[in-house]
Amino acid sequence: MSETSLLPRAHGAAVLSAAMRSTPDDFQLDELPAFEPSGEGEHLLLTVRKRGQNTAYIAKQLAHWAGIAEMGVSYAGLKDRHAVTTQRFSVHLPKRIAPDIAALDDAQMQVVQSAWHNRKLQRGALHGNRFVLTLRQVQGEREAIEQRLQAIAARGIPNWFGEQRFGRDGANVAAALAMFGHVQAEDGTLLPAPTSRRRLRNDQRSMLLSAARSVLFNRVLGARVAQGSWDSALQGEAWMLDGSRSVFGPEPWSEALAERLARFDIHPSGPLWGVGDLRSADQAAALEQGALSDPQSEALRQGLEAAGLKQERRALRLRPQGLDYRWLEAQTLQLEFALPPGCYATAVLWELGDVTDAGRFNVGMRADA
């Protein structure tokens, strides 16, 4: 397995090539909140529109503005720097006295809404994210592109973890291997990693654990896509309820399951690796174990188990909600859609074709690192 190998496309060969994010306005994201503010309490909810800055930087600015420690500022999820995004932050102000909110507004961020709430904002506390993406220098037949978009809307896409989870050139996965005591030689051989005295911060460790889990999931999903079963049932399937983390099965295939699968009420699932038995069995479990039988995957699995993570599941299939498109110019295509928390817009782009992302790197779904 090579560093640059990419996962398969479920809908066939690429139908376009394009460029994205020559300007932050080409990538717009708005959080879809999970609740309305209570109007009382000691947590000030600020809805911030930011441009060209990442979430951690804005959180630091808010802490400085409020005169509190950074841990007093919370948010539901991390948003990209190279974009125009709208997201909520909660600022803990026990005395319910807020500095001048207008002082926060500048070219990089604007507060578009503020309200008090009785609890701090928790990670993942949102319904999802709505994206408006502008692709420029589009090459490809318009009819084929539109047919692919219609197929994506009808059938969905594989629920890949995006390239940004793994860092540039898969650096986060290599760092996770090192954290687990391994280094990979050019020929793929795993060797003991040199002993390091450097202690990782909790957030760094969490990032590397997530990268390790994500690349293992992508390898299983890649095997299902190659087999053509990413959106259908295998014997021993562990099913995930749409819009939740609830998992059930395996159970015998039935007409009722087929109907639920067809209406996107349930999805096949894959492992987020950790301690414990796989929820799948039979054919599904055999595929998962086979996809993760190489030495690097085995090392990542053992490292995640040693770190104490528990076995969880993630849906293999994802259907973008409200997918719409418009041609702004002959070679400029704008896409709009919503995704659940933890799902990646780059997974949608990957099913269309090869997109060069000026804000980051080429859009690709990594099988290996």
Curated annotation (Swiss-Prot):
UniProt xrefs under PROSITE patterns: TRUD, UPF0024
EC supergroup of this enzyme: isomerase
InterPro entries: PsdUridine_synth_cat_dom_sf, PsdUridine_synth_TruD, PsdUridine_synth_TruD_CS, PsdUridine_synth_TruD_insert, TruD_catalytic, TruD_insert_sf, TruD_pseudoU_synthase
EC number: 5.4.99.27
Biological processes annotated in GO: tRNA pseudouridine synthesis
Highest taxon listed in the record's lineage: Bacteria
Active-site residue numbers: D80
Catalyzed chemical reaction(s): uridine(13) in tRNA = pseudouridine(13) in tRNA
Entries under SUPFAM superfamilies matching the protein: Pseudouridine synthase (SSF55120)
Gene Ontology MF, one: RNA binding
Keywords: Isomerase, tRNA processing
GO cellular component, one term: cytosol
Domain TRUD: 156-318
Family: Belongs to the pseudouridine synthase TruD family.
Role, per record: Responsible for synthesis of pseudouridine from uracil-13 in transfer RNAs.
The protein's name: tRNA pseudouridine synthase D
Lineage per the UniProt record: Bacteria, Pseudomonadati, Pseudomonadota, Gammaproteobacteria, Lysobacterales
